[in-house]
A protein has these predicted regions:
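Intrinsic disorder/low-complexity segments
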Residues: 65-120, 131
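Flexible, gly/pro- and Lys/Arg-enriched active-site loops
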Residues: 5-68, 119-207
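Absolute protein N-terminus
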Residues: 1-2
Length: 207
């Protein structure tokens, strides 16, 4: 199942200068509860905005052609270096001994790279990422705007936090969704000592 999760203002604003506009503790708590143990897919800017990098206890997928090409280039260099070392060693090996060829090659038909240092999988596109997910995998699309736009036609469900406010400044917006989705459940929350605006947890399914 593909689920889009986001916090949106009345005008569908979601961010400003690559940062969230609203800081809602209950929204963050809900986000953690829904996504923990599952796969999250995000764009490069969303990944870079995470204070501590990859989110724990989740499979983190980052969509980025530049990161993918960079990782591809680094791995090719490592492969070529390993091959060169093997070729050089061949001149000094006694006859009859076999030298194992480098086993670290980039799969020609696989476009994914796992970066263990960052605990992320990198794909050049959403299509490629979804192709490398299991059919029964619970997938959460967490942003940003361009990834939301790409994922919206493919999504099965929307889990939105709708905030009863229109921010003064915003440069990133969630795509229009009202015409194709119907409300499945709603949980309204008033202003309190930790939340400056009324908000609602709203789940949508396709009409």
């Amino acid at each position: 199942m593909i689920t889009i999760i986001a916090a949106v203002a009345k005008n569908r604003a979601i961010g400003f200068k690559n940062k969230l506009i609203y800081w809602l503790p209950n929204d963050l708590k809900r986000f953690k509860a829904l996504t923990t143990g599952h796969t999250i897919i995000m764009g490069r800017n969303t990944y870079l905005s995470l204070p501590k990098g990859a989110l724990p206890n989740r499979r983190n997928i980052v969509l980025s052609k530049s990161m993918w090409k960079e990782e591809c280039g680094m791995r090719k260099e490592n492969t070529h270096a390993a091959d060169s070392a093997t070729d050089s060693a061949a001149f000094s090996v006694p006859e009859g001994n076999l030298i194992p060829h480098s086993t670290f090659h980039i799969p020609q038909k696989d476009s994914t790279f796992h970066i263990p240092q960052k605990n992320i999988d990198v794909f050049p596109s959403l299509e490629e990422a979804l192709a490398h997910c299991a059919p029964d995998e619970d997938i959460y699309i967490i942003g940003g705007a361009s990834v939301y736009r790409q994922a919206l036609p493919l999504a099965d469900r929307l889990c939105l936090t709708e905030i009863d406010d229109t921010p003064a400044e915003a440069d990133t917006f969630f795509p229009p969704y009202e015409d194709d989705w119907q409300e499945e459940s709603r949980e309204d929350h008033p202003v309190d000592d930790r939340h400056d605006f009324p908000y609602a947890f709203v789940d949508y399914i396709r009409k």
